[in-house]
């Protein structure tokens, strides 16, 4: 909106809502003697070799039904006011300021049913309910043999596993899903009718798990507000300076649970709802310089500050305390955002025949990066917001801000050109190439639990945290990325063949070096083609993604064994697009 000839106002308001409902049933079968040798520390290829696959020794051991429902609503508005000025032919620019506010509401509700129908009466009831599947085993009712019904009657003999992972791995037989769902509903309906051991309340066949159905529920609200002021100045025709600052304020309020493990967690939840408020604000200055001494040379410099906020799931006020093994499931509500100071410098050359070539250097210094150091001994409960009686307990997975600064450095080379000067149809050729190389160094803190015993007399035992670190690359950061695109534009036709190649990526940290993970190198080819048709606004397009069907693979550091392999395959989109 133009208020005056040199004063402009704009703004927007948006609202959104997202729901995600999940209904998952797990049916568990167990084989006590599944392998011909120990499977500990063995890769998946070796697992396939030592598996017995003896269905006569596989038994039904229960099920789990999880229902989770999440909801997130967001409302955002933004207002910007801009004033353009020109004090002289050598000094002009604009002043701009504005505000943005975003409010989020989140909720999560989980319910969990499970059952362990391993008692004779329960299984006998199941056999009689589904005689078409278990007729040959009904005669076992009243004997101990009924608890060892093999996998055969559960098998879905019409299931076709097809070729899994290019035939490298055998999936084996699968249980009949329809039968298993019917068994689930049968025991859910007859949860207390098929068990002779009614003296123990937990011995019923089917239970609604009180603890897991309440403990992980949460709801909360986040308010984000940002105000900024910037000035964009042109000093003559060659120099542009843009500077300013953004003030960010973030407040969160989340409700979760503090609980103690009861003797029978499935029947009794020992916990109370708790509410936690947190607030932080930051001033984030920035500076951008652009100098263009001649028409074919462009020099840029930028100094900025950015934040990486912790995942909301990591700052819930959740505590679950188990007295049996003196352990705590713990979320750190005091984690702060990680802050990055960024420096970017680039120089670009532009010539009408050669095209555009640029070289860039970037640096990032990240403080307060969020990490997990593994287990931690509670030597002083006040450090973690815990009560005094929890001294000596163990936090299972302790996340906090990294006290060491993370350093990331890199170079970027970019080339873009169009061969417009070639004769005839060759003038439509297009070439784009980009190469980025980075190096990073991160000190990942590592906590070892040290036990010291003085046999005295008197006997004295002491437990302590030994904090150290190991050095590795920044997580999720490849050392090299290469993009190349070859295209052709002629009249109403446009096509691009592109390739993306990146080196291995450090994917997962871990206390144990053997469990840290990296990806394999990755190369992917894509094709995009479109043709304008002789109807105004109509075009036909073809997109082929992952032409060579590249595979994502993660591997453990030391053994080179696969930890994850994902086949996304090739996708082809063919269609029409109409613009009006």
Residue locations for each model-derived region?
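Flexible glycine-rich, low-complexity coil/linker segments exposed to the extracellular/periplasmic environment
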Residues: 17-61, 122-215, 376-399, 458-468
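Transmembrane beta-strands of outer-membrane beta-barrel proteins
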Residues: 1, 9, 93-99, 241-245, ...
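Outer-membrane beta-barrel signature, preferentially recognizing the C-terminal barrel domain
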Residues: 220-222, 278, 307-366, 385-419, ...
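C-terminal beta-signal and adjacent terminal beta-strands/loops
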Residues: 501-510, 530-580
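Short loop/turn motifs that connect adjacent beta-strands in outer-membrane beta-barrel proteins
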Residues: 86-95, 110, 237-238, 296, ...
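Surface-exposed extracellular loop regions of Gram-negative outer-membrane beta-barrel proteins
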Residues: 1-12, 50-52, 62-68, 72-87, ...
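Gram-negative outer-membrane beta-barrel transporters
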Residues: 363-365, 370, 383-506
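Transmembrane beta-strands of outer-membrane beta-barrel pores
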Residues: 2-6, 69, 73-75, 85, ...
């Amino acid at each position: 909106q133009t208020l005056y000839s040199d004063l402009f106002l704009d703004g927007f308001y948006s609202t959104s809502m997202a729901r995600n409902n999940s209904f998952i049933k797990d049916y568990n079968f167990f084989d006590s003697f599944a392998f011909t040798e120990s499977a500990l520390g063995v890769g998946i290829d070796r697992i396939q070799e030592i598996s017995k696959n003896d269905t006569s020794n596989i038994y039904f051991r229960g099920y789990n039904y999880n229902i989770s429902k999440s909801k997130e609503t967001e409302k955002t508005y933004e207002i910007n006011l801009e004033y353009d000025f020109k004090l002289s032919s050598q000094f002009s620019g604009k002043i701009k300021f504005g505000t943005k506010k975003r409010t989020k509401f989140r909720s999560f509700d989980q319910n969990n049913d499970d059952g362990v129908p391993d008692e004779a009466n329960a299984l006998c009831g199941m056999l009689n309910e589904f005689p078409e599947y278990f007729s040959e085993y009904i005669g076992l009712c009243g004997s101990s043999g009924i608890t060892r019904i093999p996998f055969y009657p559960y098998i879905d003999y019409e299931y076709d596993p097809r070729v899994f992972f290019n035939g490298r791995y055998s999936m084996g037989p699968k249980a009949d899903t329809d039968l298993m769902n019917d068994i689930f509903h049968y025991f859910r309906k007859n949860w207390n009718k098929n068990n002779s051991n009614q003296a123990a309340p937990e011995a019923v066949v089917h239970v609604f798990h009180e603890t897991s159905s309440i403990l992980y529920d949460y709801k909360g609200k986040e308010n984000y507000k940002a105000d900024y002021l910037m000035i964009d100045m042109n000093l003559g025709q060659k120099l542009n300076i843009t500077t300013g600052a953004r003030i960010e304020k973030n407040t969160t309020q989340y409700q979760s649970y503090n609980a103690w493990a009861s003797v029978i967690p499935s029947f009794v939840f020992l916990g109370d709802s708790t509410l936690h408020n947190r607030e932080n604000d930051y001033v984030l200055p920035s500076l951008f310089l652009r100098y263009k001494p001649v028409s074919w040379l462009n020099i840029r410099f930028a100094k900025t500050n950015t934040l990486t906020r912790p995942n909301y799931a990591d700052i819930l006020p959740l505590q679950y305390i188990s007295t049996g093994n003196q352990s705590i499931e713990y979320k750190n509500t005091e984690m702060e955002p990680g802050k990055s100071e960024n420096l970017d410098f680039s120089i670009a050359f532009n010539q009408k025949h050669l095209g555009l070539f640029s070289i860039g250097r970037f640096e990032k210094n990240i403080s307060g990066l969020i990490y997990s150091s593994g287990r931690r001994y509670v030597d002083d409960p006040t450090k973690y917001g815990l009560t005094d009686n929890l001294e000596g307990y163990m936090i299972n997975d302790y996340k906090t801000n990294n006290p060491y600064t993370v350093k990331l450095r890199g170079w970027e080379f970019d080339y873009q050109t169009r061969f417009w000067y070639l004769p005839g149809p060759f003038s439509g050729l297009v070439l784009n190439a980009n190469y980025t190389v980075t190096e990073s160094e991160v000190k990942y803190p590592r906590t070892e639990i040290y036990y010291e015993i003085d046999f005295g007399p008197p006997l004295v035992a002491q437990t302590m945290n030994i904090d150290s670190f190991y050095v590795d690359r920044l997580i999720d950061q490849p050392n090299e990325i290469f993009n190349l695109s070859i295209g052709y534009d002629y009249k109403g036709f446009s096509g691009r063949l592109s390739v993306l190649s990146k080196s291995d990526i450090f994917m997962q940290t871990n206390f144990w070096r053997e469990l840290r993970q990296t990806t394999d190198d990755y190369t992917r080819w894509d094709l995009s083609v479109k043709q304008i048709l002789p109807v105004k606004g109509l075009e036909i397009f073809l997109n082929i993604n992952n032409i060579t069907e590249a595979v994502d693979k993660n591997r453990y550091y030391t053994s080179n064994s696969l930890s994850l392999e994902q086949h996304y395959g090739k996708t082809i989109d063919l269609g029409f697009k109409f613009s009006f």
